C-alpha cells in the first residue's frame, strides 16, 4: 500500500508508467529507474511512497482491480435485478472491454499472475479478484440453476475468462472481446440447456 501523503495526481501517472514499462521490457526488467523516467519523477519518490518496485506493482494491480470492479458494478447497476442472463453477460463484458482490454493492462495482468505464484501479497490480491468474480457469477446463476450446478458453471465461465485472457495477451492482435463473448455465451447456453433437461 502507498504511504499516506502520496499526491493523488501522481498515483495514476505512476500506475500508467509501470504498465507502459512492463509492456515494453517485461516485469523483471521493469526497474524503478525505468519507471521513474517514464513517469517523470525521481526514484526516491517511488521508494519513499511505495517502498520500491514490489509496492508499486501491488498498487498498479490494486488500481486495475478497482477499475474492473467499478466497471462490473456500473454494468450491473443498469440492469434489472431479475435479468439474470443479461447480468451474467455484463459481468463477462466487464472483463473484456475498455481499460481491461488495453494491451498494456493485459500484459500487466499476465505479469501479475506469474509473479503471484511466488508472492503472498500478490497471491492474496489474485484470490480476492477470483472470489469476487465467482461471487458475482454465482449470485446470478443460482437464480437459473441449483447451487451445485451454479457453482460448476461459475467456475467454468471464470476458467474461460482466464483462458481467453491468457491467449489474448500472447496474441499480437490482443484480446478479441466479441469472440470472447461468443465463446463464453455458447458455453453458458449449452450448460443452461443441459441442466434444464435434468429437471
Curated annotation (Swiss-Prot):
Protein origin, superkingdom: Bacteria
PROSITE patterns (UniProt xref): HTH_TETR_1 (PS01081), HTH_TETR_2 (PS50977)
Recorded GO MF terms: DNA-binding transcription factor activity; transcription cis-regulatory region binding
Pathway in which the depicted protein is active: Amine and polyamine biosynthesis; betaine biosynthesis via choline pathway [regulation]
Domain HTH tetR-type: 8-68
Gene Ontology biological process: glycine betaine biosynthetic process from choline; negative regulation of DNA-templated transcription
Function: Repressor involved in the biosynthesis of the osmoprotectant glycine betaine. It represses transcription of the choline transporter BetT and the genes of BetAB involved in the synthesis of glycine betaine.
This protein's name: HTH-type transcriptional regulator BetI
Amino acid at each position: 500500500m502507498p504511504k499516506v501523503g502520496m499526491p493523488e495526481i501522481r498515483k495514476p501517472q505512476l500506475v500508467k508508467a509501470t504498465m507502459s514499462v512492463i509492456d515494453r521490457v517485461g516485469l523483471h526488467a521493469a526497474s524503478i529507474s525505468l519507471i521513474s523516467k517514464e513517469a517523470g519523477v525521481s526514484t526516491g519518490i517511488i521508494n519513499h511512497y511505495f517502498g520500491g518496485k514490489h509496492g508499486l506493482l501491488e498498487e498498479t494491480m490494486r488500481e486495475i482491480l478497482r477499475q474492473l470492479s467499478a466497471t462490473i458494478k456500473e454494468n450491473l447497476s443498469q440492469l434489472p435485478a431479475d435479468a439474470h442472463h443479461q447480468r451474467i453477460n455484463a459481468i463477462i463484458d466487464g472483463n473484456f472491454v475498455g481499460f481491461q482490454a488495453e494491451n498494456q493492462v493485459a500484459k500487466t495482468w499476465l505479469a501479475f499472475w506469474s509473479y503471484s505464484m511466488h508472492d503472498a501479497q500478490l497471491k492474496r490480491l489474485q484470490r480476492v479478484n477470483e472470489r469476487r468474480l465467482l461471487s458475482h457469477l454465482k449470485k446470478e446463476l443460482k437464480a437459473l440453476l441449483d447451487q451445485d450446478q451454479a457453482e460448476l458453471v461459475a467456475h467454468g465461465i471464470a476458467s474461460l475468462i482466464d483462458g481467453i485472457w491468457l491467449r489474448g495477451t500472447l496474441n499480437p492482435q490482443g484480446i478479441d472481446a466479441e469472440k470472447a463473448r461468443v465463446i463464453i455465451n455458447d458455453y453458458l447456453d449449452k450448460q443452461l440447456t443441459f441442466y434444464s433437461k435434468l429437471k
